[in-house]
């Protein structure tokens, strides 16, 4: 079986990044990559044409098409297709924010939404949490906190910088997700959710390897599903996304007061400028920022 799709240059590079984890084959003339993934061979050409061949060619190609549940803009892969009617299940969902921001914490939240609470959560209007303004999320978060079982892991910069030499950012994410999920499971016990949905940032096997390598005593693994854009598939992830964002914003506000200057979110030029100003004032960045980011060196060069 053969399937061919056409992608833009950015998507082609993303695909090359994703497939770099698989066994490579001899790259044909005019191609950027050629790999074997399960029962499919995938070859991406500089022209933007990507050819899928083999028994699972159609399924592999579907991961990269807009109408697919799979979203692999980064090297991520769903463990399995979500079950039918998943949106109406009782689900414990988790999400994190702050991994790509220089200033502030890495914040992870987990929220349990039972079937009987689904309508209440829908009424909050959070189905697409990524489109909500910060002010709107700040109004919704207290209601989620008061009504739904939840837990938040807020890894502030100083602790983050202590852990970073030992764990890469994805491993820190995995540890935080696992810990938050475990805490919520303890809170709702003896109730067991029908499923756990993690907003995906790593391949399933890689996620669990992160936890094993970190020697986590308790690893949550039963009925766990992974998908990117998880907030689109269950309200529990949308609720978790909102909690994580609001806690991050609160932490950023407090850090800004301590620093005596508004700390911007993100990792752009404004961040470099503010970091340089803190250095001029003799302020230690480790309390405010994730030091391994390239922004640290950029700020130093601005002095």
UniProtKB/Swiss-Prot annotation:
PROSITE patterns: RNASE_H_2
Keywords: Cytoplasm, Endonuclease, Hydrolase, Magnesium, Metal-binding, Nuclease
Pfam families cross-referenced by the UniProt entry: DUF3378 (PF11858), RNase_HII (PF01351)
InterPro entries for the chain: RNase_HII/HIII (IPR001352), RNase_HII/HIII_dom (IPR024567), RNase_HIII (IPR004641), RNase_HIII_N (IPR024568), RNaseH-like_sf (IPR012337), RNaseH_sf (IPR036397), TBP_dom_sf (IPR012295)
Zinc-finger listed as a keyword: no
GO annotations of cellular component type: cytoplasm; ribonuclease H2 complex
Subcellular localization(s) per the UniProt record: Cytoplasm
Domain of life: Bacteria
Gene3D superfamilies: Ribonuclease H-like superfamily/Ribonuclease H, TATA-Binding Protein
UniProt EC number: 3.1.26.4
Family according to the record: Belongs to the RNase HII family. RnhC subfamily.
Function in brief: Endonuclease that specifically degrades the RNA of RNA-DNA hybrids.
Protein's name according to its UniProt entry: Ribonuclease HIII
Taxonomic source organism: Leuconostoc mesenteroides subsp. mesenteroides (strain ATCC 8293 / DSM 20343 / BCRC 11652 / CCM 1803 / JCM 6124 / NCDO 523 / NBRC 100496 / NCIMB 8023 / NCTC 12954 / NRRL B-1118 / 37Y)
């Amino acid at each position: 079986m053969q399937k061919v799709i056409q992608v833009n240059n950015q998507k082609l590079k993303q695909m090359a990044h994703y497939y770099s984890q698989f066994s490579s084959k001899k790259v044909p003339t005019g191609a950027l990559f050629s790999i074997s993934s399960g029962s499919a061979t995938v070859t991406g050409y500089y022209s933007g044409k990507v050819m899928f061949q083999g028994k699972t060619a159609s399924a592999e190609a579907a991961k990269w098409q807009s109408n697919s549940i799979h979203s692999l803009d980064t090297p991520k892969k769903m463990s399995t297709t979500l079950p039918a009617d998943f949106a109406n299940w009782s689900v414990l969902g988790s999400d994190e924010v702050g991994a790509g921001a220089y200033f502030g914490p890495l914040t992870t939240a987990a929220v349990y939404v039972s079937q009987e609470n689904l309508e209440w959560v829908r009424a909050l209007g959070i189905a697409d949490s990524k489109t909500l303004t910060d002010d709107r999320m700040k109004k919704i978060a207290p209601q989620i906190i008061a009504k739904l079982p939840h837990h938040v892991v807020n890894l502030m910069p100083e602790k983050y910088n202590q852990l970073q030499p030992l764990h890469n950012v994805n491993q820190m994410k995995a540890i935080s997700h696992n810990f938050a999920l475990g805490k919520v499971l303890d809170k709702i016990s003896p109730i067991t959710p029908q499923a756990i949905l993690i907003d995906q940032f790593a391949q399933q096997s890689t996620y669990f390897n992160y936890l094993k390598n970190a020697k986590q005593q308790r690893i949550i693994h039963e009925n766990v599903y992974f998908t990117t854009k998880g907030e689109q598939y269950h309200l529990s992830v949308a609720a978790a996304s909102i909690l994580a964002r609001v806690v991050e914003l609160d932490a950023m506000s407090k850090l800004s007061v301590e620093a005596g200057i508004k700390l911007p979110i993100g990792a752009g030029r404004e961040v470099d400028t503010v970091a340089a100003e803190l250095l001029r004032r003799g302020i230690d960045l480790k309390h405010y920022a994730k030091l391994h980011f390239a922004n640290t060196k950029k700020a130093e060069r601005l002095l």
